[in-house]
Design a protein with these regions (language model features):
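Histidine-centered metal-chelating micro-motifs
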Residues: 97-98, 168-172
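Non-heme Fe(II)/2-oxoglutarate
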Residues: 1-82, 89, 96-99
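PLP-dependent enzyme catalytic core of the Aspartate aminotransferase-like
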Residues: 198
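Catalytic core of non-heme Fe(II) oxygenases with the double-stranded beta-helix
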Residues: 87-164, 181, 191, 195
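A generic structural signal for short, non-catalytic loop/turn and secondary-structure boundary residues
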Residues: 6-8, 78-83, 104, 131-133, ...
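Ligand-binding loop in jelly-roll beta-barrel domains
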Residues: 170, 174-184
Length: 198
């Protein structure tokens, strides 16, 4: 007897950024009032700043190449997709700040990359007691809750975690209480690709 199951829903891609590349990414992030990006974002976060796209792309090429291969298989593209970074920004998240459930408009895919996860936040998450996923988690939501259907994926991120997903995939970031600063980079992309004929 043979059997199979079918992939369903959006592609949620994950990989880990190498330490050397994390160091380079940190070097292109800065708190510059002239680069304030908050007017374009949904987050309740005080410090969010634009990143130079050329610098970001130069570091991220190998990871976007891996995503390209995954997308080719998931979406049955004839060839790899042409991926263009349209915006990138750094988030300096502090106690009490959060990102409400939202999507990214004007793009095909989005990503989030975690640069620094302080130990205090890890301990706060481990100590959490409750039915949710706890402080500092990122959650992705697809569709509505229903029996025998997986509609959400939740992660407590580690340093170097990189997630890439359709811009239309709802996601949110839980707040935390620790007196620390967690740094992440988000980006949006447009994708041009030709699907395989059915």
């Amino acid at each position: 007897m043979t059997w199979q199951f079918f992939y369903w829903g959006p592609l949620l891609f994950h990989t880990t950024i190498l330490p050397g590349h994390l160091k380079k990414l940190r070097s292109i992030c800065r708190k510059d009032p002239k680069l304030d990006h908050r007017k374009s974002l949904a987050g309740i976060i005080q410090h969010e700043y634009t990143i130079e796209l050329r610098d970001y792309l130069e570091i991220m090429v190998p990871y976007l190449s891996d995503f390209n291969q995954a997308a080719k298989e998931w979406y049955s593209f004839k060839k790899g997709a042409d991926i263009l970074v349209t915006s990138a920004w750094v988030n300096y998240m502090k106690a009490g700040e959060f990102n409400p459930p939202h999507i990214h408009t004007g793009c095909d895919f989005s990503s989030v990359l975690f640069l620094d996860i302080p130990e205090e936040l890890k301990k706060e998450n481990e100590a959490y007691i409750g039915t949710a996923s706890g402080p500092g988690c990122i959650q992705f939501l697809s569709g509505e809750p229903s029996k025998y259907s997986i509609h959400q994926k939740t992660f407590f991120p580690n340093e170097g975690d990189f997630f890439m997903f359709p811009g239309s995939l709802r996601h949110l970031v839980y707040p935390f209480k620790s007196d620390i600063e967690r740094i992440s980079i988000a980006a949006n992309y447009t994708v041009k690709a030709e699907p395989e004929p059915k």
